């Protein structure tokens, strides 16, 4: 399937942000990067704010799609635990796109759009956090930590092992950990 110009612009903006940060992103550099005229970029996104809104919407759609794939069925038919497990699995197994971290950490007020998009998704899939057990809330923090570790660990030395991912999914479902998981690793 052919990529739309709008999608090309969003992807290009993320690639540039990954290299230079969102704060240095301009329509001119973006147009050159994606092979369009400045007017071609502005046709789809009249302002940088509209571009950032488009990026946030694209992330939200991608996150929803990944969570639905992990769920394997309609959201409306899933229990709360199934929704939380699916969202967790989609984050643990999902890809972090170039520029995703740059967008999250951008100093621009518009970067709040991505945080708002994530919070919207989390409310849809998790519900009220205060209603979860302490174990579940700690597991959700572990999901955030897993994502951050993968985003910043360029050496590939992070704790991204399947057993750890399975433990996080189990905890987020409200299950207590199996004692065998607490034995020290043979790795030094």
Question: For each of these PLM feature ranges, what is it?
Answer:
Residues 5-16, 30, 55-59, 63:
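Generic hydrophobic, amphipathic alpha-helix propensity
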Residues 12-20, 66-69, 142-149:
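Solvent-exposed, amphipathic alpha-helical segments
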Residues 61-100:
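Hydrophobic alpha-helical connector segments
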